[in-house]
Amino acid sequence: MTLLPSPKLKLKTDNQSLGDKTALRRKLIKQAGLEPLRVLDLFAGEGTIWGSLRQPARLKNAPEALNVESYTPIDSVARQPGQIRFKITPRLIAALDEGGGLSRYNCVDVDCFGDPFAIWQALLFRIRVPTAVFLTRGRVTYGAGRMPISKLAKKVMGIPEEWDVPGKVELMEYGDRCQLLQPCPTAKIAFGYKITLRRVDYYALLVKPTEAHATT
């Protein structure tokens, strides 16, 4: 599967680009035909992204509001009404999925500040219905030419955990790709889009379960 970046979405903006994020989500959701949406918003913050996507159009040529049937925001700090306050970890994803609970959602947003791939892995192996997954991958440099490489990235790339690997950009990008496209017997990425900016990547992915693991 090849991630296909859309030239129309490659906007030169900063890491906080609401326009990029909302355009990317609209494009995938409309193409996948997932409405009405049942949204699980991880790292929800003040709910700015989904507040914008649900807002009725005020201008003539503005896009229509997305049809959101339910919205569940979760973050470690309470910043909006109705939010669940909890630290976002793979253990939380497992708890949410007890009794097949993740099947209640057909849209999962992981708009974190750093590495989303531990959460991505926890989600991928539990998806039982066609689901839009949105990932924000931020990059922070620690020292000259170094960035942190997670234990999961090393594992997926086949690098021993104890090795002190130079955090070069090329290796980080390869590690991200390996984690994103890791083999999964229960679900696969049907198609996706990616926006690459200087310090952040935005991914929009439609994930479908295999026939044997789909929830009817």
Regions of interest found by a model, annotated:
Residues 40-42, 65-75, 108-110:
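Short, hydrophobic beta-strand segments that form beta-sheet elements in well-ordered domains
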Residues 1-61, 74-103, 107:
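S-adenosyl-L-methionine
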Residues 114-127:
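A short, conserved alpha-helix within the catalytic core of class I
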Residues 33, 127-128:
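A generic alpha-to-beta junction signature in SAM-dependent methyltransferases
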Residues 130-144:
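Conserved beta-strand signature within the Rossmann-like core of class I S-adenosyl-L-methionine
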Residues 37, 106, 131:
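Conserved acidic residues
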Residues 152-210:
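A conserved mid-domain beta-alpha-beta active-site/ligand-binding segment of alpha/beta enzyme cores
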